[in-house]
Amino acid sequence: MIYKYANLGYKTVMSNSSAFYFDMVDDKDLDNVGLSWSGYADYKDMWTVDVFDIFNDSYGVEKNNITKEYIESSEKLNPSNRDNIIGIQSQIWSETIRNEDILDYMFMPNIIVFSQKAWSKDPEWMKISDKSNRESTLDYEWNKFRNTIGQRVLPIIDNIYGGLSYDLPKPGGIIKNDTLYANSAFPGLNIKYTTDGSLPNIKSSNYNNPIKLNEDDVVNLRLFDNNGRGGNPIQVDK
């Protein structure tokens, strides 16, 4: 709809609920706080949006199963009206915000990703026509950006006013050939693990490299910030 009004000559601001609403949950995990009426929107969904051609976002198109027929029937922005898109806007609604910690969790690092989208020029990968080359370049650039957030930006946030209760996503984990492999959405944060089924705490072992497991080990993972605050844990199935 935004392109319709921009093409009619109106100055418009994009506020896309499927990418720019901070109160949308990113997956079906019941531990997440927020809403899902506009789908599941994670940090990468926000980062990959092409403001001037939303269907040029191949990551979002594929994730949301948007058909070729739908794309062809939808109004596109006339290049001559590009200047009518004067910005983008994020939203955070308070229906599910019951305390300050939930506000922090929805706000940060969402605002970091959104600010990068709002204040940066179009990335080069958006101009790549070859699908394989585009996807590999996109993944490379996204990996750089999320490493920057985890290793440089969030440690600064930890020291502002004693830190914010920003989102600490559950780590990812898999067990292959009796070996544990784990990662996090923002490399640089601390992944703690236990193998006895207990809840990882700040004194638990750090995950730094793949770990060989015993047959009866029960693995739990949990992400921690530099102030010792932990996120929700996850148990890794064998």
Model-derived features with residue positions:
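Flexible, acidic glycine-rich loops studded with aromatic residues
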Residues: M1-P171
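Short, compositionally stereotyped local motifs that mark structural "simplifiers"
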Residues: K131-K238
